[in-house]
Amino acid sequence: MSTKELYIGVMSGTSMDGVDCALVEFDQEQVRLIAHSDYPMPADLRQQLLSVCTGQATNLKQIGELDHRLGHLFADAVMDLLSQAGVDASQICAIGNHGQTVFHQPNGEFPFTTQLGDANIIATRTNIDTVADFRRKDMALGGQGAPLVPAFHQSVFALQDSTTVVLNIGGIANISVLHPTRPVLGYDTGPGNMLMDAWCETHTQQNYDKDARFALQGEVNEALLNSLLQEPYLHQDAPKSTGRELFNMEWLTAKLQGQNYRSEDVQRTLCEYTALTISKEVERFRYGPTPQLLVCGGGARNPLLMQRLQQQLSHWQVSTTDAKGVSGDYMEAMAFAWLAYRHMHRLPSNLPEVTGASRLASLGVLYPKA
């Protein structure tokens, strides 16, 4: 009797550059990517979301309307993937939808996280059971609600005799540390593409620095770099998580202190900042004869960033997750398909040693299709 099941993972990250969808086959715990798609996010929707995420004035009406629009956008993305793959909705066990994070505050007296994208709309329009709201159960148990992907990394990358670190460079950079003899660790190291993208968009009207062309025109400004490295978040102990609430243009403007830096030098310095904040954390976990760093996410396509990581981590084998047979572009979407699979089978999917939660739990809330 076949145990193969199909799930769809839907991810819209902090970069807000579109919706990633992954059609994933599970055979027990074996994972295979069947099909994938990128679905564009309308420019006006992205701008509204960015304004909300960066603390500009909003109201409940706008939040409610964004929740509704995103629900339809995610449903459209799923139906587009099914059409491309030639798969009927009836063949899908469930959708795992992350939603669009607009605020994440894991610390303080009233910890909370907010993801938009009405899963009721997704379930009813696609006619597929939908699992969403993955982070708040972990937070209710005292955890950070993030990162959630290390549990998936643990399931797909076999342990070696040396440390394997899986690095996802999205808007924020986060690592999963797979040590041969210790529990899995995972946390956000700091900014990934977020600051580079924001600065590039401000000064070149491009959403991101393609092939690092803008950064390669500049030089690292050591004084600015040292100022950026003073950020207190970098010196906090794990478990920890961060986002656009901290690392945004307002934060960067304050660090610039009105100095008249060349824009290309700032871009180059931001790239160096991302590389250094990552490599410093990765190097802490070097163990064994052949430690490896596996990179995924949009930052893996930044040649300057990858070059600097290789240079700063000379004792590590640095490659992309694609070299290990797991798509780097769709890693997070695959992870949320996996989280939905775990939910539907009532299996735990958080790692308390990673998030700080008091116990294991099956994450997510089911929104039935009927």
UniProtKB/Swiss-Prot annotation:
> One GO BP annotation here?
1,6-anhydro-N-acetyl-beta-muramic acid catabolic process
Keyword Iron-sulfur present in the record's keywords: the answer is no
- The Enzyme Commission number assigned here is 2.7.1.170
Q: Which GO terms describe its molecular function?
A: ATP binding; kinase activity; phosphotransferase activity, alcohol group as acceptor
- Which residues are recorded as binding ATP? 13-20
Highest taxon of the lineage: Bacteria
Pathway annotation? Amino-sugar metabolism; 1,6-anhydro-N-acetylmuramate degradation; Cell wall biogenesis; peptidoglycan recycling
> Which SUPFAM superfamilies does the entry mention?
Actin-like ATPase domain
Task: Write down the Pfam families for this protein, in alphabetical order.
Answer: AnmK
Q: Which keywords are on file for this protein?
A: ATP-binding, Carbohydrate metabolism, Kinase, Nucleotide-binding, Transferase
The free-text function statement in the UniProt record for this protein reads: Catalyzes the specific phosphorylation of 1,6-anhydro-N-acetylmuramic acid (anhMurNAc) with the simultaneous cleavage of the 1,6-anhydro ring, generating MurNAc-6-P. Is required for the utilization of anhMurNAc either imported from the medium or derived from its own cell wall murein, and thus plays a role in cell wall recycling.
Q: Which family does it belong to?
A: Belongs to the anhydro-N-acetylmuramic acid kinase family.
What is the recorded name of this protein?
Anhydro-N-acetylmuramic acid kinase
Where does this protein come from, organism-wise? Answer: Vibrio vulnificus (strain YJ016)
Upper lineage is: Bacteria, Pseudomonadati, Pseudomonadota, Gammaproteobacteria, Vibrionales
